[in-house]
A protein has these predicted regions:
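Nucleotide and nucleotide-moiety/phosphate-recognizing core
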Residues: 1-125, 133-154, 169-172
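Conserved anion/nucleotide-ligand pocket segment
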Residues: 156-158
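A residue-level signal for conserved active-site and pocket-lining positions in enzyme catalytic cores
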Residues: 132, 160
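SAM-dependent methyltransferases
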Residues: 161-178
Length: 178
């Protein structure tokens, strides 16, 4: 997208927000080749989708900023705000215009989330928010998210060729994404 891989964009933003290289949670056999400079860790409980990835991140790193690698327009400043919120909560999740009103795949999670995620998986709940009732969750209000950009752009996911074409248009029309 715009001459750069989406993964590279996300890694760069995470590194700016956290001040250190991120951990790449991936199960693909060739994942270590995607970014040889990053530590790659497979899911600790394979087969549980995004929730398994969040679990892996918190059990490996303790506190973790988790961002889906197909979210090319997320902001480093937004991620830093989410991470700062962990001082008063176990998870910090931004509000959005999505169906569920939250973006759990662009959030900060603390170590207390690990046992709660394991409990959710054990009861068959693999939703990315399935453990939220068991931990202290702070919501970053949509009004606060707007300080970092349009939520529809910040949390845009590239899942299809049509999404990629839309992302290319966004990239061309916003100088900050080039």
């Amino acid at each position: 997208m715009g001459g750069r891989r989406i993964l590279d964009r996300v890694v760069d933003v995470l590194e700016r927000a956290a001040g250190s290289p991120p951990l790449l949670v991936a199960n693909a056999a060739d994942a270590a080749q995607w970014r040889p400079d990053l530590a790659v860790v497979p899911d600790v409980l394979p087969g549980h989708g995004s929730l398994g990835g969040i679990l892996t991140a918190v059990e490996t790193a303790g506190a973790a900023l988790c961002v889906a690698w197909d979210m090319p327009f997320v902001s480093a400043d937004l991620l830093a705000a989410l991470a700062a919120g962990l001082a008063a909560a176990d998870a910090v999740v931004p509000e959005s215009d999505s169906r569920r009103g939250l973006e759990p795949l662009c959030a900060a999670y603390g170590p207390a989330c690990g046992p709660a995620i394991r409990a959710a998986i054990a009861r068959g709940d693999a939703r990315a928010i399935g453990f939220h009732g068991e931990v202290r969750v702070a919501r970053l209000p949509r009004a606060a998210v707007l300080q970092y950009g349009d939520p529809a752009v910040l949390f845009f996911n590239v899942n299809t060729p049509d999404d990629l074409a839309r992302a290319e248009v966004i990239c061309r029309n916003h100088a900050s994404f080039r």
